[in-house]
């Protein structure tokens, strides 16, 4: 790996998921537009790792290594195959996907997940269940994302779990990445892992875990708002201006609403 590629990779993979297009534009300027394909390839890796949604009209599809098929991706539930522009995150060249049907376990998990997401996430949340190749395991993924660059914030919720049918176990991780940059720059990241555990109902186990995660997240943020953020008001000797972090950050929504806005 070249030094340039390492630097670009570090920058991209440390960026808020909803600001990648801005990062791409700036990297193009810094590299004089000479490394467009190399940068785009790294961003594709980033998008797959973060399971970013690609949009076509009102439809949104998840992108990951689980549903990659050649240069395209497939949606096992909606039975479509689609290409993705990883910079604009637009889906295109959509065609019918007929390579394989969803299994009964996959369909049942999707139906239960759909009910859970509709009850606890914004309408814009995207989710799916992918069968992990050469195993009796399923990847359960939920993404809730939104941005308002004009209002200086972006938010991204990603939860991903692996359900093992043979062992009736569930394991996974949930993470939140919220960036607020009006008159300052505050980025809040939090992650929690669900260790492998027995389950009679994977989606119920996910719901219980995420409810506890969100409670802890809100408590943690309230503590920071009352302590660290207040302290920042006394550390601005250059501009001699005070930023009301308590009020600004206190109005920012976290948890499942991290991507919903005020």
Swiss-Prot record:
Q: Which PROSITE patterns match?
A: F_ACTIN_CAPPING_A_1 (PS00748), F_ACTIN_CAPPING_A_2 (PS00749)
SUPFAM superfamilies according to UniProt: Subunits of heterodimeric actin filament capping protein Capz
State the superkingdom.
Answer: Eukaryota
Keyword Ribosomal protein, does the record have it?
no
> What Gene Ontology terms describe what this protein does at the molecular function level?
actin filament binding
The yes or no answer to whether the keyword Secreted is present is no
Q: Which UniProt keywords apply?
A: Actin capping, Actin-binding
Q: Which Pfam families does the annotation name? A: F-actin_cap_A (PF01267)
Name any Gene Ontology BP term: barbed-end actin filament capping
Under PANTHER family, the record lists: F-ACTIN-CAPPING PROTEIN SUBUNIT ALPHA
User: What is this protein for, i.e. what is its function?
Assistant: F-actin-capping proteins bind in a Ca(2+)-independent manner to the fast growing ends of actin filaments (barbed end) thereby blocking the exchange of subunits at these ends. Unlike other capping proteins (such as gelsolin and severin), these proteins do not sever actin filaments.
Q: How does it assemble?
A: Heterodimer of an alpha and a beta subunit.
Similarity field: Belongs to the F-actin-capping protein alpha subunit family.
Protein name (database record): F-actin-capping protein subunit alpha
Organism field: Kluyveromyces lactis (strain ATCC 8585 / CBS 2359 / DSM 70799 / NBRC 1267 / NRRL Y-1140 / WM37)
What is the primary gene name for this protein?
Answer: CAP1
């Amino acid at each position: 790996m070249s030094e340039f590629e390492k630097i670009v990779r570090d920058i991209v993979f440390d960026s808020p998921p909803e600001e990648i297009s801005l990062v791409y534009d700036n990297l193009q300027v810094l590299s004089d537009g000479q490394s467009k394909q190399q940068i785009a390839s790294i961003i594709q890796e980033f998008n797959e790792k973060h399971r970013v949604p690609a949009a076509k009209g009102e439809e949104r599809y998840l992108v990951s290594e689980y549903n990659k098929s050649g240069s395209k991706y497939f949606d096992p539930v909606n039975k479509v195959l689609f290409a993705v522009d990883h910079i604009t995150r637009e889906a295109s060249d959509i065609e019918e996907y007929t390579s394989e049907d969803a299994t009964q376990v996959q369909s049942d998990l999707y139906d239960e997940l759909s009910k859970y997401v509709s009850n606890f996430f914004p309408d814009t949340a995207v989710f799916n269940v992918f069968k992990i190749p050469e195993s009796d395991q399923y990847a359960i993924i939920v993404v809730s994302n939104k941005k308002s660059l004009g209002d200086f914030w972006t938010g991204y919720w990603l939860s991903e779990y692996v359900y093992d049918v043979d062992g009736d176990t569930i394991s996974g991780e949930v993470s939140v990445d919220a960036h607020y940059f009006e008159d300052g720059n505050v980025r809040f990241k939090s992650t929690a892992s669900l260790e492998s555990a027995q389950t009679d109902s994977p989606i119920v186990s996910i719901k219980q875990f995420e409810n506890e995660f969100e409670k802890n997240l809100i408590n943690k943020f309230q503590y920071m708002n009352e302590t660290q953020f207040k302290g920042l008001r006394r550390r601005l000797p250059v501009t001699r201006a005070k930023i009301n972090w308590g009020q600004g950050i206190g109005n920012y929504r976290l948890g499942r609403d991290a991507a919903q806005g005020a």
